[in-house]
Amino acid sequence: MILECGCPEHYPDWHNQDIDLGGQCAHILPIPMLAHMPMSYDSYLHKQREEIGLLELKERWPGMALMATGAFRGKLIRLIENSTSPSRRIEYLPRPFQLRGWLHPGDIGSIRTPVHEMQLDLLDLGRTPQELYLSYITCTRCYEQRGGHKTLLLRRWVDSPTLKKRVKPLA
């Protein structure tokens, strides 16, 4: 269920876990960015929610959107139930699509340290970090009622045999 402000009421418990979303059906909406900062983020979230509603698709976690940033273009990803919709925005995520999750009790201004720690943990396990996805669990309207700012950080990774050889096993 989606709250009145647009935030997800329920979200997956992916804190400090590895998740494989490979083969999951997703609605992917490209969004404009400027220096990795989304432009009109709320309006694109609303547009994506409206498109999913018009297509009569069912989200796995209603209201939860993953945002991937880029210098000038990013994307919003919402996981949906398997669908045979002819929409050009419905795609299946590639296999493998390994992610390391981290529930950060803060907003975008304080994610530097947890992202760095997550990256070091992945490197210690012989995994190469790839792109970073953000999912805002709370917004500026509901964070006080829901226990403060919460941001789900998801770092995509791939196994690296070369890196595994270089990393000494922890005893």
Where are the model-predicted features located?
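A solvent-exposed interaction/effector surface
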Residues: M1-A171
